[in-house]
C-alpha cells in the first residue's frame, strides 16, 4: 500500500471515529433534545424512546471497532450511518424536512445536504475497511502524522460544513 493510500486509509478511519464520538457524546449530553428528534421522526412508539441510549452506545462501540480493528471492519459505523441515511432519505421523499436531524452538534433540519454528507461518510466507511494494511517501519512516522493530520482536517471540515448548514437555515428562516 502506498503512503498516500495509507494516509487516506487511516485518515478516513480517524474522521469516522471522531464524528461518531462527537455525535455520541452530544446525544448523551443532550438526551432530551435527542429524544425530541427521535420523537419527531414519528417512527417509534413513545414507550420505545426509553431506549434512546442504545443509539449513542452503538456509536461508541463503532468508535472502538474502528480504533481496534485496524482495517478489518467498519461494519457498525456503516450500519448506523446507513440507517441514518435511510431515515433521512425517507423523510425527505415524503416532504418532512422540518425535523431536527438529531445528528449531533448544532440543530440542523433535514436536507439533501445532510443526506449527501452521510453518503460521503458511507464512502469513507467502505474505503477505510480495506483489509491487509501493511505498515512499513521506515515510513511509519510520516504515515501516522499524515493520517492524523488528514483525519483532523476532515473532522474540522465536517464541523464547519454542519455549522454552515445550520447558519444557512437560520438565515433563510427555515
Model region roles, listed by residue range:
Residues 1-172:
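Membrane-interfacial helix-loop segments of redox and metal-homeostasis proteins
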Amino acid at each position: 500500500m502506498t503512503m498516500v493510500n495509507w494516509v487516506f486509509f487511516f485518515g478516513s478511519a480517524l474522521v469516522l471515529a471522531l464524528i461518531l464520538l462527537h455525535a455520541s457524546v452530544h446525544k448523551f449530553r443532550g438526551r432530551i433534545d435527542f429524544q425530541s428528534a427521535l420523537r419527531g421522526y414519528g417512527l417509534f412508539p413513545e414507550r420505545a424512546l426509553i431506549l434512546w441510549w442504545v443509539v449513542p452506545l452503538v456509536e461508541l462501540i463503532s468508535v472502538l471497532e474502528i480504533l481496534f480493528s485496524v482495517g478489518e471492519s467498519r461494519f457498525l459505523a456503516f450500519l448506523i450511518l446507513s440507517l441514518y441515511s435511510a431515515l433521512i432519505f425517507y423523510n425527505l421523499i415524503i416532504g418532512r424536512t422540518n425535523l431536527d436531524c438529531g445528528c449531533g452538534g448544532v440543530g440542523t433540519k433535514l436536507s439533501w445536504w445532510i443526506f449527501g454528507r452521510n453518503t460521503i461518510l458511507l464512502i469513507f466507511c467502505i474505503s477505510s475497511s480495506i483489509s491487509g494494511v501493511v505498515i512499513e517501519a521506515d515510513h511509519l512516522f510520516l504515515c501516522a502524522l499524515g493520517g492524523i493530520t488528514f483525519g483532523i482536517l476532515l473532522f474540522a471540515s465536517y464541523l464547519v460544513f454542519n455549522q454552515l448548514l445550520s447558519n444557512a437555515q437560520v438565515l433563510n428562516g427555515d
